[in-house]
Amino acid sequence: MNDQFKTQVNAKYAFYRTHYVNNDDKLIEVDNLYKQREVYVSTANMYTIFPFWDVSMSYDFQWNEMKADMYGFVFPTRFTTLLSIATALRLGKVKLQGSGLATFVNDQVKEGPAPKARQILTPAVFLSYKPFDKHDFSLRAFYKKTFRMPTFNDLYYADMGNSKLDPEYVTQYNLGIVYQKQWGNKLFRHFKIQADGYYNYVKDKIIAYPKGQQFRWTMLNLGKVKIRGVDISTETMINPWKDLFITMKVQYTYQKAQDYTDPSDNYYKDQIPYIPWHSGSAIAQASYKGWDLNYSFIYVGERYNQQENIKYNYTQPWYTSDISLSKEFKMKFGSLKASLEVNNLLSQDYDVILNYPMPKRNYRASLTVEL
């Protein structure tokens, strides 16, 4: 287009096939085949009114269809339309962004009553302020509303889906700081630290937890959930000698996610299922002439596997280490990347979800071609 007007168009088609078979004679035998199709198109346009002021508009359309070979299946079809208008202002040390997203969702079924059509407008406002000229330090804040429709998996998978699920509405408040510094040809090349505190109010939060079989989960809405949390992350890069760069990242999250639906419930103000209070990760990467060596450590703290925070529902923390080595080769037709991964390096026993043991030490090799 030109320097003032820019546009982008995307399109996607996807097909998913899920075949679930359970021949355990102690349980109900199941042999279900699900097929899903998705078509997605979007266009985004941005116009620069002044060097300090941009406006944009985007339009998205998505079509989803689900079929299954079960008696009485409803064969749902969903039409989703998204229309967004946004603006961004840069006024000296202040950056201000605002947007409004209109969402229209229409579900149709071949059997039973038609689901209710949904129309919702969700605004967002973002603000950042950089108080110092000589230091890359900024304060940021945002207010945002979001809306999430239950997926077809949430609604219609047999003995898992809940066709009565309501959409999830979230109101988010966030305050944060960011500081970063760049150095030239020195040992330390880059350092960044950021911290955010947030409060989310969630109406009809959609959660899932297993009934005891791998494919069968309970889907339900929690009427009112309040989430308070802190995210802290740091990143640094060093260059000990020519062509060798070492990057280290550390991230920590504290999250208190409580169910405030009904004061008469035994689990009123309890932490909601499978949300840990503490979690974090550490990543180290060494890069040298196209070779990359990566190590990652993930920690998930204690949590509960049901709505009541009692000893019987307590779930132990878990942590794991992974390592990978990759090499990128430049070819005439593009590039070729070969990688080898060792996951769960210490071969530990752990469950992300109760009674769903994760693999012990395992290996994966891959080749990726880019044209």
Locations of regions flagged by a protein language model:
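Residues on the lipid-exposed face of transmembrane beta-strands in outer-membrane beta-barrel proteins
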Residues: M1-D3, V41-Y47, L83-L89, V125-Y129, ...
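Short loop/turn motifs that connect adjacent beta-strands in outer-membrane beta-barrel proteins
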Residues: N2-K6, T48-D54, G92-V94, P131-F137, ...
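Membrane-embedded beta-barrel scaffold of Gram-negative outer-membrane proteins
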Residues: Q4, Q8-Y20, F132, S138-K144, ...
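Transmembrane beta-strands of outer-membrane beta-barrel pores
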Residues: Y13-R17, F61-K67, L91-K93, A102-Q108, ...
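Signature of Gram-negative outer-membrane beta-barrel scaffolds
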Residues: I28, F52-K134, Y143
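Gram-negative outer-membrane beta-barrel transporters
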Residues: K93, H190-Y201, L220-N305, S335, ...
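C-terminal beta-signal and adjacent terminal beta-strands/loops
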Residues: K203, Y299-Q306, T315-Q316, D322-L371
